[in-house]
Amino acid sequence: MGEISPRGGDFDIDYILENASSLEKISLLAGHDFWHTAPLPRFNVPSVRVSDGPNGVRGTKFFDGVRAACLPCGTGLAATWDQSLLFDAGVLIGQECLAKGAHCWLGPTVCIQRSPLGGRGFESFAEDPYATGKLAAAYIRGAQSTGVISTIKHFAANDQEHERISVNAVMSERALREVHLLPFQIAIADAAPGAVMTCYNKINGQHVSESKEMLDGLLRKEWGWKGLIMSDWFGTYSTAEALNAGLDLEMPGPTRLRGPLLELAISSRKVSRSTLDERARTVLEFVKRANKAEVSTVESTRDFPEDRRLNRKLAADSIVLLKNESGLLPLNLKALKSAALIGPNMKTAAFCGGGSASLQPYYSISPYQGIMNQLPPGVEIIYETGASSYVFIPELEASEVRTPEGQPGLRMRFYREPPSVKERRVVEETILQESSWQLMGFSNPQLDRLFYADIEAELIAPATGPFEFGLAVYGSGSLFIDDQLIIDNTTVQRGGNFFFGKGTREEKATVDLVKGQLYKIRVEFASGPSSKLMKPGVVNFGGGAGRLGMVQAIDPELAIARAVEAAKRADVTILGVGLTRDHESEGFDRSHMDLPPAVASLVTAVLDVAPDAILMTQSGTPFNMLPWADNVKTHLHAWFGGNELGNGIADVLFGVVNPSGKLPLSFPRRIEDTPTYLNFGSERGQVTYGEGIYVGYRYYEKVLRDVLYPFGHGLSYTSFAYSDFAVDTASATLNVRNSGDVAGAEVVQLYIAADATTSSIARPVKELKGFAKVTLQPGETCSVSIPFDRFTTAFWDQEAHVWTCEKGQYRVMVGSSSQNILLEGVLEIKETTTWSGL
């Protein structure tokens, strides 16, 4: 391959296909490197840059990359239920792409959350396929309005991390169509994303990246898809099969399964030259379109005031007020004398989930910071952590350590040889701002796949007492303090969830430190090929990774006791608990819904002495809130809220913003209640989608199962009245009035129910088929119209293999949640019709 081209000029696709050699055409069909397509300099075809991820644009580096805007996670964006706002969010994503020099954004994610345990559930929008498709379409339209290309992913049913590259997702044709493909179908029809990324998994026995039925038959022929189909990273598993099925682009590069293997496949007539030309044409069309984007020539930043304002609105509008029984919120700042801010999530800025969604933010605002920013002088603040909730021991930040030369941070030096070789030459050096490193995509021409690195820093102990250190690696590593071996994660390794499930467990050791004393820290690291672990079904991203953590050991009982005393003293107690990217991440699924035991005990203990405490929970997907959730009076839920998380929370707490978020997921009472309790995770390479079409609220309603908080639920500081409901063949209309004292926004949700006595097939109790968000001043009334479309009454007939709209009467319901239906009407379909395609 040649050098990566700068932005090229125009090029003639037909001319290239007529005059390029087979080797040149083949080179187009795999990435040049981790983040770029291959150029053809002879024909003025440039390289195109792609970049993750669903809630921000990381750029080309997991390791030592440029900082970026971080938006709320997918479920947080969906909680706004605001298609106009998601368009604006997409515009910001597109602008970030341009600043990072990226022509193509690898997002959004639209796989359905079958289970609360799915590691990437926070990346997707909602448990409902219709809502997911509509919200994703708005996000895509916004991003593509800037000229960049969106890549909708992961096609399809990539909803668990366990053995994700090998698991066979077995489901009915109806479940596949009505639940798992429908978000893609709606978003493609409404927004025309420029690319589709295939999933890692199999569906009904075949990897989707080599399924002719899924890629050529359904996506290209039935849906008329004209855009690019790319693999997920290292998600190409064959040469001829994938090419013939319709997979245009293998990512990342350099190629593993094209190149010489594709030459052989063409020579042996397993792949025709016409197929080669078809795939090359699609890639060239993609590059031609992408090259029109006015991207920066260098990876840069754009942390502008208007971006911060938008991100703050996204954070605030995503927050869901679950309970406000005593009317405590919004808090009256003028009457506030003292406040206890308690909990492990209070000073943690959990701005994003883990994996492809993670990035280095321009900045992050913790709930504690956000609250402090708005408190007037004179309010007494009592802060207590109360309990630890981390999975991995917290990383060392640059402010806590210095390099041997005295700079903030940790010095990382790369070598060709191991530490046993004296007088090694330093090949590359960088300064880490935190004590973790992910080296997939990292390369240096002087280093082989097996290379070595020393991470060194000086630590001045902040206190006297026991400190816990932890080291997790993909590769191998050992921790030394003052040249004494403290942790050996080289000789014997135990598999864990670190680094997309490829790495080790975090090995730990406790060391007594003396306040003010200087300690020399060194990690001797070797890259991925030195690992002793082998795991089935796990993506091999290569490179290597490591994470060093340090935390002062605390007595759990004493920490809770201090929090209880703080709650007793304060006028108002705000308790912040939940999950972080340690708990929710690409690479692994949660094994349970529970909080760490100490955190659950903390909540119970604080509520016992402060029953009016405000509970602020945070996560991307539901977690176990029993037994205390039934007793709490005031409860709001934030998500992984992006850069402005803490400011958004404070805006809602103090009434700067009237909460308008609604749950895009049902919050179950127990994991045992969920539709996938018996059918989640790979068993001998297979997972059966036994719930069929009954995902989320559809399941809970069908089996009469109570939930803690229903799909679509969310309260406001004002109230709304619905009236004058009318239904015709094209739409449903109603009036909504703000009957309260403050301005606010309401999400009107429309559900359809088939008549069970006349329907020829089992249907959900009701299905979401439309929604609209309106903002009203006190006393203001507006008319809301929600149009019907071809999906309004349709189901997939898996015998005839078509969508069917069956004649009969359908109940049309509108309400403020799936369980709070306020008005009903009737839609009559006079004759049965069938259809296919988009």
UniProtKB/Swiss-Prot annotation:
One annotated GO molecular function: beta-glucosidase activity
Domain PA14 positions: 405-564
GO cellular component: extracellular region
Keywords of the record: Carbohydrate metabolism, Cellulose degradation, Glycoprotein, Glycosidase, Hydrolase, Polysaccharide degradation, Secreted
Matches recorded under SMART domains: Fn3_like, PA14
Residues annotated as the enzyme's active site: 232
Cellular compartment(s): Secreted
Catalytic reaction annotation: Hydrolysis of terminal, non-reducing beta-D-glucosyl residues with release of beta-D-glucose
Enzyme Commission no: 3.2.1.21
Protein's pathway: Glycan metabolism; cellulose degradation
Residues glycosylated per entry: 19, 324, 489
Domain of life, per lineage: Eukaryota
SUPFAM superfamilies: (Trans)glycosidases (SSF51445), Beta-D-glucan exohydrolase, C-terminal domain (SSF52279)
Enzyme class: hydrolase
Any one GO biological process: cellulose catabolic process
Role, per record: Beta-glucosidases are one of a number of cellulolytic enzymes involved in the degradation of cellulosic biomass. Catalyzes the last step releasing glucose from the inhibitory cellobiose.
Family: Belongs to the glycosyl hydrolase 3 family.
Protein name per the record: Probable beta-glucosidase K
Chain's gene name: bglK
